[in-house]
Amino acid sequence: MENLPEPLRVVAQELAKLPGLGPKSALRIALTMLKMPKEKVTGIGQSVIDLREKLCICEQCASITDTCPCRICSDPKREHDKLCLVSEWDSLLAIEEMGLYRGYYLVLGGLLSPLDGVTPQHLEFQKLEERLEKGEVKELILALGATVDAEATASYIKNMVESKYPGIELSRLAQGIPIGSEVKYTDKETLRQSLEYRQKL
């Protein structure tokens, strides 16, 4: 990239800092922007600035929002006794897009990972305890995934809820063999969970 004109090189280098974009892809995007009308490029730049300036973290659920509290937390028609715990905001979006769940959410901001130095203090566990202490939540739904870190986080939450809030029902998303898969190709852990959480017919 050293042979590129300075402004083009700088834009390509900045774009390459985004996850999933390598130097070549970043350069292609920069060249595409160079071909666009000035107003469109200015619009893209302004929208990126607005992204940082006009969004905030909801004080109740820790999701990304442009209003505080967010639209979900402000909705009185939601089921107050259900709280769905997700690791990141995009998980909340995925669940919300299905339109099946009508309770509230809390975004943890990640998963516990001792190897990476992520402890309960780095996540929204204090906010979780504040929500549970109010006494409105009757069911806590863990929608954290099926990774090793998700299992560690679920175990930590289970121990906390059982010791401090024994009246709260704890559930998690069902896990098992995906639709369209065959048993013989399923990994051992997925197969174990499928057997453990088997359903009656």
UniProtKB/Swiss-Prot annotation:
Functional description taken from the UniProt entry: May play a role in DNA repair. It seems to be involved in an RecBC-independent recombinational process of DNA repair. It may act with RecF and RecO.
SUPFAM superfamilies: Recombination protein RecR
Pfam families the record matches: RecR_C, RecR_HhH, Toprim_4
Domain Toprim: 81-178
Zinc fingers typed C4-type, residue spans: 58-73
Protein known as: Recombination protein RecR
GO BP terms in the entry: DNA recombination; DNA repair
